[in-house]
């Protein structure tokens, strides 16, 4: 306990006080004889009577409420509400209005709001709720009188006390409390709780923190949030709702008093209540809520809050002023008693300069946090450190085994560590968990600062993440890998910590994020052969190399080597897997690597690149064809030695297929290296790409003796070369006198003129071979009857072509005549275009000498409109 308030006696006189109201340093007394008296109370000038109205009413003044901003005093006397003007002292409570509709009122409550309009104008809205018998009747103040809100609530009993906050009106009956939500079209009733669990007690309600209800139940003060009773889109339909403060999860638990409350006022941050034998001052925070007991005011009947730090208390004929002790004095006492929360609340409402106030609050938070940490309340301590916005490094210093290295410029230690408790086992784990939560918040704050690219923030973030790493290793190591991927941990300190805990996989992540790829790959190579290691095998190395990308190509080649030697098939996936990083590797350099060190993988690599990735690079196609050709040559050589070579047929088929289907290789370059004594069929494909038809046909006829392939080739190229069948016949009718290539004998069927084959081709393709061109090459002794079929087909074809040409000429001549006649008809069409004519497109008139277009349907448009329409049609 400490002294929060001092008591000053104001008046001891013969008037019988029936009600009391106050604002600022003014207090208004309502007497049993109907008098109104206003006093001004000042610490320096003392007590001064400002207004006095001896004959305001013939009946007692039972209740008063002041609206200081509007200089209005609402008075309840003779069961009716009246309004006075307290603006001018000389007026002595000038009467303004008496509300006849309030006749029968036993008590009332008010709601004052100052909404801001869209234009920025602030107006005061005053609403009054009167208890008239068993009804609540609502009014509003406008144009100096009370007007009906046309809202009436029927009650089950006569209310004893009322309190209005926003959309809710709380009613205290002799045995229970009820809240009415008046935000909807119809009032909604919500039952709260009984006034007492055992006997009937007078209800007591007070407004807490301007938006909460403080309600007395037995010896408790229950804080209720009225917003939970507001109907929102028909969701809250319950009529019996448990108060927030009665819920075990509420932050404001019921406040115990020495005896049931008789009266209560709220003076931030204290609840000041009148109990049986004294006035008690209590705080809503902390374990020990009792702040002060004022036994000398045990005879009081009334309490009223006037202003911040000022309360008036009254007995039947006495008046006291209760003033708050200066906050710095209270704060000093509270800090000595280690009541840090209350010290913070008091400092928040002090009149000290904002900067000084913020600094003081920060210091109290740090003291409170240190006290909580010493008491092993780690989670609460970290929350206080967070509120103090302390340097996270100073919090980390509370854990000596977590401090990575001294931080430059921190000789002035904010949080002393000498008195911190030694932590072991469960306490240490709880402390680590609390520290993790705190550092997670601190990390978010530092990341925001990093956007300003401040190096100090980067350094602090590094310390935070390194500390988090150590905490995770002690509490939940599954969080280590995600933390390392954020790439803010200190390399050397984290490396040492991970090695100490044998976290090899996490160490790889650290190296990877820090760009220490060589160290990571060395470690992977070492662990690959260790039995039982989490990194045993090749897969992790393969995946790591795949993710490096083209910027680290030398490193990929260096560490892919051992994988390729160990398992070529798996190792090849380093360069062929379906990953963006893999596909983007420079393929020419990868090819050079395979050619120089792993030649057996050149063909599989190029096949994947060309077949799967559809690479059309000429170099790659040329190299693959060269590899195919060289391998086929080696297999042929082995076959000549009598060895079995099952690979020969499929490999030669691959070579033939690629030469036939690929359009991306360079045929002239391939031809330079291609052998002339073997693979002549493949050579023919290359020559065909070079359009050397005579050479191709010579190979098919004179070397291979394959008339079918020669004929098929001629048919395939007939459209581009109409004389190709003439070339084919010449190959058959004029055999060469010597071999086409050294060491390659001529085919025996075509070393001499083969008349049968020649006649068969002539008869089959007669329409494609001109007799005038071929006759000079026919043997002189060839009988004419053998050529009869060929000549008949050929001549018929020529006659049909001539007849078709004649018919076409006739058709064209007739069409020309028709078009000339149609043109003449169009030229003979006349139309009138004058100043009244308008364009059918833009609806504007035609100006003199303007260009226009006339459509066949008779519509006439400007030339520019026609062009615009034509462009629009073209775009569609």
From Swiss-Prot:
GO terms for molecular function: small GTPase binding. CHCR repeats lie at residues 578-741. GO terms for biological process: autophagosome maturation; autophagy; cellular response to starvation; endosomal vesicle fusion; intracellular protein transport; regulation of SNARE complex assembly; secretory granule-lysosome fusion; T-tubule organization. One of its GO terms (cellular component) is membrane. Residues 14-310 form the CNH domain. Pfam families: CNH, Vps39_1, zf-Vps39_C. Disruption phenotype: RNAi-mediated knockdown causes impaired autophagosome clearance in fat body cells of starved or wandering 3rd instar (L3) larvae. Conditional RNAi mediated knock-down in muscle cells disrupts transverse-tubule (T-tubule) and myofibril remodeling in internal oblique muscles during metamorphosis. Keywords: Autophagy, Cytoplasm, Endosome, Lysosome, Membrane, Protein transport, Transport. It is a peripheral membrane protein. Its main location: cytoplasm. It is found in: Cytoplasm; Lysosome membrane; Late endosome membrane; Late endosome. Belongs to the VAM6/VPS39 family. Part of the homotypic fusion and vacuole protein sorting (HOPS) complex, composed of Vps16A, car/Vps33A, dor/Vps18, Vps39, Vps11 and lt/Vps41. Interacts with Rab2 (GTP-bound form); the interaction is probably direct. Part of the homotypic fusion and vacuole protein sorting (HOPS) tethering complex involved in endo-lysosomal vesicle trafficking and lysosome biogenesis. The HOPS complex facilitates docking and fusion of lysosomes with late endosomes and several other types of vesicles. The HOPS complex is also involved in autophagy and crinophagy (the elimination of unused secretory granules through their fusion with lysosomes). PANTHER family: CNH DOMAIN CONTAINING, VAM6_VPS39-LIKE PROTEIN. This is Vacuolar protein sorting-associated protein 39 homolog. It comes from Drosophila melanogaster (Fruit fly).
